[in-house]
């Protein structure tokens, strides 16, 4: 008897309970369990103890305070819940029990499971990838709002937009944001906004609520419609702690509707500052361009002064005329471009700034244009005057000018220039060049 017992693996009670606990924890892993709460207690330790049961069985459960503080409701006896748990054994008493890691009301639990499944599916398809998200426009021309016409979210968005950018156009696409038909209506509103293409950013959202209240923003049709939108979309659903599938798919997630309005609006004071910066940049660009043209003209004038032959002078004169014309055309084009830019800026200011400021800035631009045109005209007159002086100097040394003073040039009929009487003999015919024509003569003697 003693020898047979020695060959057996004999457990102590504590060892048996320990190995059973390890077996349960390692082999079973995480389980999801639905049941009714009974015998709920919450002692001063902060841990929760309860029993989960159905019509045929029950099991003891423990939920330690590190996990139960994340539960957003107070469990009640008789309440149906969905729990995420692991199996274990309380070794001192040998009690089989469930260690709870999370707990939700049973209805919320089903929705949460659907949420996680759809989230995993869409993530696998790449709908949450940052690479497919579109940037928000820096200065939206029109903002679309997809929400309930009677909800607090619309009031909050419009209030922020009126305060920050009162002249920003807004288009409201009213839709249900709660209930069975809400998801389809939201998707249709997004599609309608893309078809009409009147806005360059959309805010899709509503105020806070329960998981069921916000569930329309977790529908697959809403997620795929947001992903397919050509217009950037900001999701603004509930409060900062509320997270929906729409938040993951949208190009930008705002924690609240008011925050979404902040994202799409710029303070009108910033726009006035940007206008002043454009004006300063325009003036600096014009001064720099004129300085470059003056330097180039000075170089050309220096070359012209150093080259006196008539043909070269004529070429330089032609180049000067062409450069003057190009300069004038360039200045006119530049002024026209700047005028167009100014007109666009003025149009924006008419929407966002006092009218008298726009008129004053336009008056200043007209004066500046007049001063520039006057400077160009004076510059061209001076250039033509200098060219006339150079032409007079050239005429002073021209052979034609010498003929005009009464001198003549004599050549033989072969075109040889006659400088000495020894070059001719009696009977030769000579051609004498005068200012206004030629004379043929015959040599009688020399």
Swiss-Prot record:
Reported EC number(s) for this entry are: 3.1.11.6
Cellular component GO terms, alphabetically?
Answer: cytoplasm; exodeoxyribonuclease VII complex
Catalyzed reactions per annotation: Exonucleolytic cleavage in either 5'- to 3'- or 3'- to 5'-direction to yield nucleoside 5'-phosphates
Family statement: Belongs to the XseA family.
This molecule's function is given as: Bidirectionally degrades single-stranded DNA into large acid-insoluble oligonucleotides, which are then degraded further into small acid-soluble oligonucleotides.
Q: Which NCBIfam families match?
A: xseA (TIGR00237)
- Record's protein name: Exodeoxyribonuclease 7 large subunit
């Amino acid at each position: 008897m003693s020898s047979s017992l020695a060959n057996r693996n004999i457990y102590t009670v504590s060892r048996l309970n320990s190995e059973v606990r390890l077996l349960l924890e390692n082999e079973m892993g995480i389980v999801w369990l639905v049941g009714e709460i009974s015998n709920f207690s919450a002692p001063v330790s902060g841990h929760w103890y309860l029993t989960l049961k159905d019509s045929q069985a029950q099991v003891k459960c423990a939920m330690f305070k590190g996990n139960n503080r994340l539960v957003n409701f107070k469990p009640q006896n008789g309440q149906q819940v969905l729990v995420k748990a692991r199996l274990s054994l309380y070794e001192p008493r040998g009690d089989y029990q469930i260690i709870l890691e999370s707990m939700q009301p049973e209805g919320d639990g089903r929705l949460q499971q659907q949420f996680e499944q759809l989230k995993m599916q869409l993530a696998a398809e790449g709908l949450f990838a940052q690479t497919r998200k579109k940037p928000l426009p820096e200065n939206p021309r029109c903002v679309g709002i997809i929400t309930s016409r009677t909800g607090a979210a619309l009031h909050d968005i419009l209030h922020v937009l009126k305060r920050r950018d009162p002249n920003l156009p807004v288009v409201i696409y009213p839709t249900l944001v709660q209930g069975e038909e809400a998801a389809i209506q939201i998707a249709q509103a997004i599609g309608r906004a893309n078809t009409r293409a009147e806005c360059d950013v959309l805010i899709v959202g509503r105020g806070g609520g329960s998981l069921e209240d916000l569930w329309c923003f977790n529908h697959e049709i809403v997620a795929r419609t947001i992903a397919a939108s050509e217009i950037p979309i900001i999701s603004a659903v509930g409060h900062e702690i509320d997270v929906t599938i729409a938040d993951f798919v949208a190009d930008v997630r705002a924690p609240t509707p008011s925050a979404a309005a902040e994202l799409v609006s710029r303070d009108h004071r910033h726009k006035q500052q940007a206008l002043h910066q454009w004006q300063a940049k325009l003036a600096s660009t014009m001064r720099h361009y004129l300085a470059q043209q003056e330097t180039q003209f000075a170089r050309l004038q220096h070359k012209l002064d150093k080259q006196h032959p008539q043909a070269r002078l004529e070429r330089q004169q032609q180049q000067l005329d062409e450069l003057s014309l190009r300069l004038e055309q360039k200045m006119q084009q530049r002024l026209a471009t700047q005028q167009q830019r100014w007109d666009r800026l003025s149009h924006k200011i008419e929407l966002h700034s006092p009218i008298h400021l726009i008129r004053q800035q336009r008056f200043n631009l007209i004066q500046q244009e007049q001063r520039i045109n006057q400077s160009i005209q004076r510059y061209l007159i001076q250039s033509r005057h200098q060219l006339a002086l150079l032409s007079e100097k050239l005429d002073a040394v021209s052979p034609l000018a010498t003929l005009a003073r009464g001198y003549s040039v004599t050549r033989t009929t072969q075109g040889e220039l006659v400088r000495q009487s020894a070059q001719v003999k009696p009977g030769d015919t000579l051609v004498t060049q005068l200012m206004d024509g030629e004379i043929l003569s015959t040599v009688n003697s020399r």
